[in-house]
Amino acid sequence: MARYRCCRSQSRSRCRPRRRRCRTRRRRCCRRRRRRVCCRRYTVVRCRRR
């Protein structure tokens, strides 16, 4: 499971806060199944790139 926090650019209420937060310049909110997690580089193994 992803362990990233919600992106500041996106709505925090929509994203579920995780333990760690994205440590990348480009932070985007990816939604995996029913949960939305923050993806580093907006492209993570867990999240699909758009």
Curated annotation (Swiss-Prot):
It is found in: Nucleus; Chromosome. PROSITE patterns: PROTAMINE_P1. The keyword Transmembrane helix does not apply. It comes from the Eukaryota. GO terms for molecular function: DNA binding. Protamines substitute for histones in the chromatin of sperm during the haploid phase of spermatogenesis. They compact sperm DNA into a highly condensed, stable and inactive complex. This is Sperm protamine P1. The lineage of its organism: Eukaryota, Metazoa, Chordata, Craniata, Vertebrata.
